[in-house]
Curated annotation (Swiss-Prot):
Cofactor requirement: Mg(2+)
Name recorded for this polypeptide: Bifunctional protein GlmU
Residues given in the record as acetyl-CoA binding sites: 380, 386-387, 405, 423, 440
Organism: Heliobacterium modesticaldum (strain ATCC 51547 / Ice1)
Predominant localisation class: cytoplasm
Amino acid sequence: MHKRTAVVLAAGKGTRMKSRQPKVLHEVAGQPMICHVLDALTDCGVAQPIVVIGHGGEAVRQRLGDRACYAWQQEQLGTGHAVMMARPEVPEEVETVMVLCGDTPLLTGATLSALWETHEQSGAMGTVLTAVIDDPKGYGRILRDDAGHVTAIVEEKDADEKQKTIREINAGTYCFDRAALFAALDAITPANAQGEYYLTDVLAIFRQRGGLVVAHTLQDEREILGINSRVQLAEAEAVLQDRLRRKWMDAGVTLIDPPSVFFHTKAVVGADTIIYPQTIIEGETVIGEGCRIGPATRICDSRIGENVVIQNSVVLDSRIGDDCAVGPFAYLRPGTCLAEAVKVGDFVEIKKSVIGKGSKVPHLSYVGDATVGEDVNIGAGTITCNYDGKHKHVTAIEDGAFIGSNTNLVAPVTVGAHALIGAGSTITKDVPAGALAVERSRMKIKENFLGRKHKGSQ
């Protein structure tokens, strides 16, 4: 195999995005579009491509970190100029250089691998990724000779009327022989309507020098979609979501209403899980087998066990064990950990707490900064009062305890194993194991009170 590297062009301003954020950092399927490009390159064995940065370059470098090395293009003078800026970063031992854009998140690793194979097997100086589309307006057109070899690429603004009728277009991704590429870059000039150094001009130079230029034609034209506007961003999102939905359905996941379910590209879902409408799976979430998720549920950066039911709920950065039931209308905040067979019911909020095996928080409760043992029942309306206005404090509820409805547990406080808290209590002291704790005023009944009140008002 030839020694390879890739140059990713990511220096543009993205003016039509109307955003302060660099264009390539806008997200598709939950991650910046340039990360999709780097993922595809990783699939091809390129672990650290060269990313050419300019507008918002520091933000791009901060986001990508050591996934890439970087070259600066301080002035945006065209694609050819961008590759010139990357030249010092290309190792001497590299034989083949791929050049592609950072705003093409739909390109797959399989397509890039096929492009590389076509290039290296042909012995060409340059290979162009192309597509045949119905409406080629705005794209550079591919010019071929009688043998079918590429002779040149003419940009839309420089094309004559005959050339504009050509439907085969440049997808903006190339493979080059390293030595031929940099020799040709030394010869290009900005003699065009844009006054820029076009990378595509090197292809004509290859031909003039007796080199071969070939094309690799895409079967799925959607892969070439570049993103220059919010509309195109939404179009790319739709294409990638369709891919992800098909991927998981092919893996044994049932989607009741596929168009209404959204996946992060890094999410993982087990077989025989059913996902109901209006559900969003974000971040590096892992969902086990045999679960029922949704409807109207959002799960982000969480690990869900097997045979879990989550209905109409929000789960953020949490861990849920096997056979749990969550919702409807529950809110699991970061740091929540549910052991096996836990029930969290309607209108329950849990934050930074561990709930033990078989325990239940059925409804209308807040549990924060707490450790709850096994087989605990927390009655409706229970609140762990964890905040004193300055610090957070921990509530500990040990195995088998029963917390009556409408209880306030004022932390720091411990409820011992198998203790019983009477309904309506406010607990401010530790409760020993096996004890009964009741803290409430004695009930008073005033008979005929309503009648006296009415009589006195006459």
